[in-house]
Every structure is written in C-alpha cells, then in structure tokens.
Regions:
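N-terminal secretory signal peptides that target proteins for export/translocation
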Residues: 1-4
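Bacterial N-terminal signal peptides
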Residues: 6-20
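Catalytic-site microenvironment of enzymes
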Residues: 25-213
C-alpha cells in the first residue's frame, strides 16, 4: 500500500504539472484528497502541490497534527465528516446520522471542528442517506453558516439535497464532478483526470476528489 500510494502521489503531482489550475480556457480545477488522518503514511500526500486541498477525517490519530502541518504549507483544509449511508456501513468517529436531533448534529460538528481547527469547509464521507434528508442537512448548514464555513457535496447520491439547502441558508457550496480513483489504477486515474479537464473546460470549473491509498 505504501509503495502504491507513493506512485499515486507522483502520478497526481505530475498530472497537476501538466494540468494547470488555470488552463488556456481560464477553467478552474480544484482537487481534494479525502480520508486523511488515520494512517501515518498519509503524510506522503504533503508532497503534492499546496493548491491541493486535504479533507481530514475528524477525531483520527493524525487529524490535528496533519491539520497543523497543512496550515504550515498554506494548504486549504476541510473536515471530511462521516455521514450516514444507505448501505449502513460503519461510519467512524464524529458521524452524523438520521436519528440525531439538530442540536446533537451541531454539537458533533463543533467537536469535530476542534480536531481540524483550521478547516474552511466540510464535505461528506459517504452520506448517501443523510444528504437526502432535510432536517439533518438543515442543521449542518446552520452550523456552517454560523461559523462562516462552506460545503462541498461529495455527491454520493444523485438525490442529495445538500446544495439546495445550503443555497437556501446562504452557505457557499460546491459539488464533486469526478471521482478520480474509484478504480485505483494509474491508467484509470489518468483517464479520469482527462474527464475532469473536459468538465472544467465546458463549465469553467470542476472539482475532483481522490483518496489516500
């Protein structure tokens, strides 16, 4: 896994060099690396250009130290908040679920924020169930509005209501266009990068998400 992650990091870095954040079409591309915080090997991601945003899982062994290291690199950091999935998969610490009251959701987000104190935004880890539900997403957006944070919808379901609720409550938001590494093979990742570039050239901006491996 360690050797593969190094290869993935080098691939991502080389592709970023070939794919400027402002292309000749003035298209903006944002790249987010999810799932950071559980493994010491995640530190290898810090060799990526500082324009790459890290989304750190809260309450993990390295959430605070990696958050601080990212700040030293002037790298943007997000909280990768576990949210309930339709599959019922185990979510991990700091998870938001459909049976939580609004105050409990806000308290959970506040506690998670302490472990990633310089987060400027959150995105959902899983969340195919929760992002469809009005009440928990309203509580989430109310917290973000209060703290001046924004939301990136990982779009784990096409039925997500997160963006519409964020818009209603005045929370700046974006959504994921392309998952780069759902098939973690270099050829597939390169193909997905090309897809990301096409989306950016067509719409003027695109958000890609990749993961540590």
């Amino acid at each position: 896994a360690f050797v593969f992650f190094q290869s993935l990091t080098l691939l991502l870095a080389s592709l970023l060099i070939l794919l400027p954040f402002k292309s000749v079409y003035a298209a903006d591309i944002a790249l987010i690396i999810d799932d950071i915080g559980y493994k010491s090997d995640d530190i290898n991601a810090f060799t990526l250009p500082s324009e790459v945003t890290f989304s750190i899982l809260p309450h993990t062994p390295y959430s605070l130290s990696f958050s601080q290291l990212a700040e030293q690199q002037q790298r943007e950091v997000m909280m990768h908040v576990p949210m309930e999935a339709l599959s019922g998969k185990t979510l991990g610490p700091g998870a938001l679920t459909s049976n939580m009251l609004p105050n409990a959701i806000k308290a959970s987000l506040a506690a998670a924020h302490k472990s990633v104190p310089n987060a400027i935004a959150i995105n959902n880890h899983m969340g195919s169930k929760l992002t469809q539900l009005t009440l928990p997403m309203t509580a989430t957006m109310e917290y973000l509005h209060e703290k001046g944070l924004y939301f990136v919808d990982s779009r784990t379901t096409r039925y997500s209501r997160a963006e519409s609720i964020a818009d209603k409550l005045g929370v700046p938001n974006l959504h994921r266009h392309v998952f780069l590494d759902h098939i973690p093979e270099p050829k597939h990742i390169a193909m997905q990068f090309k897809r990301l570039r096409r989306v950016a050239n067509k719409y003027g901006q695109a958000v890609g998400i990749a993961h540590t491996h």
